[in-house]
Amino acid sequence: MNTAAGPTGTAAGGTTAPAAAHDLSRAGRRLQLTRAAQWFAGNQGDPYGMILRAGTADPAPYEEEIRERGPLFHSELLGTWVTGSRHVADAVTADDAFGALTADGARPGVRELPLSGSALDAAHGNPGGPPLPGGWPHRPPDREERDDPDRHAADLLNAAGPGQVLDLVPFARRLAARTTGAWLGVPAERLPRFETALTGCRRALDALLCPQLLADARAGLAAEEALRAVLGETPEARGRPPGAVEAARAHAVSAAEPIAVLLCNAVRELMERPAQWRALTADPGLAGAAITETLLWAPPVRLESRVARETAVLAGRTLPAGTHLVVLAAAANRDACRNAGPAVTGFDVLRRASDGGPQPHGLPEDLHFRLSGPLVRRTAEAGLRALAERFPGLRPAGPAVRVRRSPVLRGLGRLPVAPYVPE
């Protein structure tokens, strides 16, 4: 049984996938079959299948089961090798034999997961080349003021009424869209369209490994096309070589929802540790340490998908070209913490600020984030710093709601907080 984790694929941007043929009925059936295959694998005791089921429960127990089975776990039913080992994760990241696309430009799982992935392919089509064709975007000096996540965060929070319950998910998404739009040179008058389209692409990373509902997949395709249209109207798009707009779209999509998830995860971790939140409000400069700890303990991208571009040896196993591999980033980070000694036992902003600790796996080193990783971190830090400065009495105002079918991001649908403690 071969699902999204399997090695089959078609050339990125090709015309053989159901999405290109607009055969939505066939695509919907294929998504249902892939979903059924992942559920069947879970029923047979496959922990990777349980992770891909992606309900609202914490996937950490299944991640740990995979890690405990050795450096490489073979999900036979899903045709994928999976690792929770930090050593193996770092080896995969450093080895050019592994990429997001095969050597001939095929994306693994395109047959099993139609209507997904095309908005991200352009970021990976030339692993050895520049992140974006023509060097876009290189920020000109006169854009310094617009490309300022601290200012964008402050402006958004100024619109929040005093004492009102604030849902951090739309705040984080709007902050991500504004900062990403400025980074890509989207004119102010087009930012509302850009924000709407970018938010509509929020399931793109999850859809690489987990079949989405057909209605959501179709909505995502429409949003991706709307985003391409907006970016094609920017001054930076003029005179750029073919593919530049698609590459810019890929980097926007790969950055935006991870920014929102990272910021929301950081707030959740701190709300669960009031003393650490108080330390942050006393010294907002700790926002960087808090984001690093969040990247370590609650990363915004938990599953990193790779395919062997050529025959490779990993953890003593020979993996033929076309082999699909998934890195469990959160498990790999916990593995690094175990090896760091007894001092690193959990989320601790003050320890990070004073003594450091293991560096999180992913982001700048990950294929999705070689260009956008610094933007993801910088924007999340700005949002967290602004919240600490503006709302030092921030507290939970209801349960957080996790999104289903979100094994990659473990995204949030709602995160209500109260800015002020009632007198």
From Swiss-Prot:
The keyword Repeat is assigned to this record: no
SUPFAM superfamilies per record: Cytochrome P450 (SSF48264)
Gene3D superfamilies: Cytochrome P450
Basic and acidic residues composition-biased segments: 139-149
Coiled-coil ranges from the UniProt annotation: none
Recorded GO MF terms: cholest-4-en-3-one 26-monooxygenase activity; steroid hydroxylase activity
InterPro entries registered for this protein in UniProt: Cyt_P450_B (IPR002397), Cyt_P450_sf (IPR036396), P450-rel_GT_act (IPR030958)
Residues covered by region (Disordered): 1-26, 117-149
Disulfide bonds: none
GO BP annotation list: antibiotic biosynthetic process; cholesterol catabolic process
Feature: compositional bias, Low complexity: 1-21
Keywords of the record: Antibiotic biosynthesis
Pathway entry: Antibiotic biosynthesis; tylosin biosynthesis
Function: Involved in the biosynthesis of the macrolide antibiotic tylosin derived from the polyketide lactone tylactone. TylM3 is required for the glycosylation of the 5-hydroxyl group of tylactone to yield 5-O-mycaminosytylactone.
Classification via NCBIfam families: P450_rel_GT_act
Family affiliation: Belongs to the cytochrome P450 family.
Protein name: Protein TylM3
Annotated organism of origin: Streptomyces fradiae (Streptomyces roseoflavus)
Gene: tylMIII
